[in-house]
A protein has these predicted regions:
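Alpha-helical promoter-recognition and RNA polymerase-docking modules of transcription initiation factors
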Residues: 1-80
Length: 80
């Protein structure tokens, strides 16, 4: 992981908890604890940092939110 990717992750780490709360994940709702969802969100944030392309026009925050939300939704669907 590059230093730039690490900076993006550390700067935007609060997005993970925010998105978990926004999408309405509550303890036990999808059979996963908050800590599990947080871990999935952090993995998604790392993935977003690794694949982010600023030349595509989106801010990192916008891109990361999409990647995190999609990964959380995928896990919710597979847990159902």
């Amino acid at each position: 992981m590059t230093e730039k990717e690490q900076d993006l992750i550390l700067t935007h780490l609060t997005l993970v908890e925010s998105l978990i709360n926004q999408v309405g994940y509550q303890k036990g709702v999808v059979g996963m604890e908050f800590e599990d969802l947080y871990q999935i969100g952090c993995i998604a944030l790392c993935k977003a940092a690794a694949h982010y392309r600023p030349d595509r026009g989106a801010t990192f925050k916008t891109y990361a939110c999409r990647v995190i939300r999609n990964m959380l939704q995928d896990h919710r669907e597979h847990a159902s």
